[in-house]
Amino acid sequence: MFDGGFSATSLAVFTALAPAGAVAFACLAAFLLVNRSQSRDWRDVLAHLLFIPLAIAWAGFIASATHLGTPANALHAINGLGRSPLSNEVVSAVAFLFFAGMAWMYSYREKPKASVMNGLLAISIVCVIVMLFHTSFAYSIATVPTWDTWLTPVNLCATALLSGPALATTVLQAVFTDEPALQTFYVRPYEQWPYALLLIAVAALAAGTVLLVCHMNFLGTVGNNVTLASALVPNYGWLIAAHTALAICGLAFQLHGLRLATSRTRGLVFSVIGCAVVIIAALLARFPFYDAYLSVGF
């Protein structure tokens, strides 16, 4: 727990879950926009499952509201829109939740118009980008040198690009599970998406691990009149190792689930477990950032 009422746990949960849910939603929205030729029933199933990443994002947003004292205080943050990084973060998150929620609810309409649905999905994708931008730079505080570094935004984005595609992969696999089994030597074009998403996650993991090591080394060069920042996170190296190991295991589980042609249901189970492990790995990557809180004063 920081001085000033900030909770490392609530903020870590927010920056792990909200970006993961938002990026996963954007991936699935892009999938729906690109694969418009699929049957309406098939698209409806996937659109209904948009609730999963939306719920993950909501969980993160609710966690973030707790460190404001009361969730109602989040409404007051809107007053600083345009001049306060926190206000920009809150408003962009609310905008995403609003349009993403509208898209999900509209999918239950008896005869939804494709143009309206596609428009809501496109706006939601834009909101995700804006939300990631403002969330990444919300911690650029000059009086907190451990946060005021270029490593802060890129680390958060790397974590989001790890967990978001992993979550989207699981949702897509849930849709594919309902389809008739295919011959193992043939993969429909749209079924290549989960593999592409996992490739993005692997690249994000590799880049994110390097960035975490850079941040750990950076903390050794920052301090105030009391201590060095590195002393605040003495187990940073072990956390990075655990984060990387868990993420590799989770992604391996998901890849195995995708390639398990004998039983798509079992494959989905592997994917769900793998996704959960990846999200835990993302949480491990976020905790050291908040534990390293160090102001320039005493």
Describe every region a protein language model picked out.
Residues A24, P165, A282, R286-F287:
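Transmembrane alpha-helical segments of multi-pass membrane transport proteins and ion-pumping complexes
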Residues M1-A22:
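Hydrophobic transmembrane alpha-helical segments in integral membrane proteins
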Residues M1-S7, V34-R43, R109-K113:
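Cytosolic juxtamembrane amphipathic/interface segments immediately preceding
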Residues L11, H76-P85, V144-L156, S230, ...:
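Non-cytosolic membrane-interface motifs at loop->transmembrane helix junctions
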Residues L283-F298:
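Juxtamembrane boundary at the C-terminal end of a transmembrane helix
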Residues L17-P19, S39, V94, M102-A281:
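Long, contiguous internal "core" modules enriched in hydrophobic/ aromatic residues
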Residues A24-F99:
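Membrane helical hairpin/interfacial module
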